[in-house]
Amino acid sequence: MTITPQHLIALLPLLIVGLTVVVVMLSIAWRRNHFLNATLSVIGLNAALVSLWFVGQAGAMDVTPLMRVDGFAMLYTGLVQVASLATCTFAYPWLEGYNDNQEEFYLLVLIASLGGILLANANHLAALFLGIELISLPLFGLIGYAFRQKRSLEASIKYTILSAAASSFLLFGMALVYAQSGNLSFEALGKSLGDGMLHEPLLLAGFGLMIVGLGFKLSLVPFHLWTPDVYQGAPAPVSTFLATASKIAIFGVVMRLFLYAPVGDSEAVRVVLGIIAFASIIFGNLMALSQTNIKRLLGYSSISHLGYLLVALIALQSGEMSMEAVGVYLAGYLFSSLGAFGVVSLMSSPFRGPDADSLYSYRGLFWHRPVLAAVMTVMMLSLAGIPMTLGFIGKFYVLAVGVQASLWWLVAAVVVGSAIGLYYYLRVAVSLYLHAPQQPGRDAPTNWQYSAGGIVVLISALLVLVLGVWPQPLISLVQLAMPLM
């Protein structure tokens, strides 16, 4: 096939981030300068975000059999870029106090963000696998970036070994699917599945293995065991990326796969996914109840959030509404997580060994950093799904979709899970307003709201509140972002 200028415009975000990777690499080789490399990375990611406008003008198309650029791809590319940008801005003050090599951090974030864009555009199992590897491999390095901290190194090794195992499951599952159907492209798979092939044992085994691999990457129960340890061990800016960008990109591609290849039509697959969703919601919330470490708590809560999203995925066959639900929910989850992890990153910057992640570090934060405490409170309320925040709109959508598809037991799980979640989110929020301990352990810098990370956190809080009261702009955007059928 010939690549036309139209195709190049459609690939702009991918090309810009790829170019930024090369530029940052050369810049590191030329001269180590933390500020320069951070600025280059942020400029590149911003340019990729702006280029989405030109992509939208070019219209939807297939660029190579592996990639399809349409509204859906643009929405998820945008979300991944926002998460990567936030990660870079949170990382800058954190790395200022870090004595080993600082610049490679941005390189790894950029490469992972490249994987995220590839996943958002993937239209083929090969692209899906490449994207997942591109997003996972840099994460091995990022999680262990503070490698002189025992926890960080341990988290990196755990994630690396388990991730390699999960990837092999995923690959073997794809091989079985290919052996049975002879296709790897999502749409061709959809056509061959339409011929009543969904009852073939080989095909079901293939999809089962793929669910194991993808379930690990999305940290769904029972493949979630790495999540709390890795969230706790990884540096705070990395936990931000792990909780947002990698989850959003992978969920986006799974969504597209289920849309084109109606795997959900198989009763067996639906039951398995239903059980996984149910277990993730209940288990994630119950385990978060007893946590005294904020990053572990957010790790367990991310398991339950992915469970809620899975409810919308199972209801995908029942109409357009669940695409909308996932888009709105992910946007709410993105901004709430960016805000929550952003506060942890600001409290932990500059690097001085372990992060400020114990709940005790946040006691009485309100009395000396009132705005930061207010932001953290808003994020906790949004994650809990309290009305007037964006988190509520997303949860409401998921419930509506569940009711529409009459998945009553999952709707019940979402309601019960949200009730349990309320307790531990409010526990974090309340501790911000208690009496401050005599000698506060860690504190955010005095002028935090003027730093790039502080601005990102404040914008996230604003978006969560404004879109929570008036969600129409977001809903319209998500409705525009429909995949090319």
Curated annotation (Swiss-Prot):
EC number(s) on file: 7.1.1.-
Membrane-protein topology: Multi-pass membrane protein
Lineage: Bacteria, Pseudomonadati, Pseudomonadota, Gammaproteobacteria, Enterobacterales
Cellular compartment(s): Cell inner membrane
Reactions catalysed: a quinone + NADH + 5 H(+)(in) = a quinol + NAD(+) + 4 H(+)(out)
Enzyme category, top tier: translocase
Described purpose of this protein according to its UniProt entry: NDH-1 shuttles electrons from NADH, via FMN and iron-sulfur (Fe-S) centers, to quinones in the respiratory chain. The immediate electron acceptor for the enzyme in this species is believed to be ubiquinone. Couples the redox reaction to proton translocation (for every two electrons transferred, four hydrogen ions are translocated across the cytoplasmic membrane), and thus conserves the redox energy in a proton gradient.
Matching InterPro entries: NADH-Q_OxRdtase_suN/2 (IPR010096), ND/Mrp_TM (IPR001750)
Full protein name: NADH-quinone oxidoreductase subunit N
Pfam families: Proton_antipo_M (PF00361)
Source species: Salmonella gallinarum (strain 287/91 / NCTC 13346)
Chain segments annotated as transmembrane: 8-28, 35-55, 71-91, 105-125, 127-147, 159-179, 203-223, 235-255, 271-291, 297-317, 326-346, 373-393, 408-430, 455-475
GO CC entries: plasma membrane
Protein family: Belongs to the complex I subunit 2 family.
Predominant localisation class: membrane
Record note on quaternary structure: NDH-1 is composed of 13 different subunits. Subunits NuoA, H, J, K, L, M, N constitute the membrane sector of the complex.
UniProt keyword terms in alphabetical order: Cell inner membrane, Cell membrane, Membrane, NAD, Quinone, Translocase, Transmembrane, Transmembrane helix, Transport, Ubiquinone
Domain of life of the organism encoding this protein: Bacteria
Molecular function in Gene Ontology: NADH dehydrogenase (ubiquinone) activity; NADH:ubiquinone reductase (non-electrogenic) activity; quinone binding
Transmembrane helix among keywords: yes
An individual GO BP term: ATP synthesis coupled electron transport
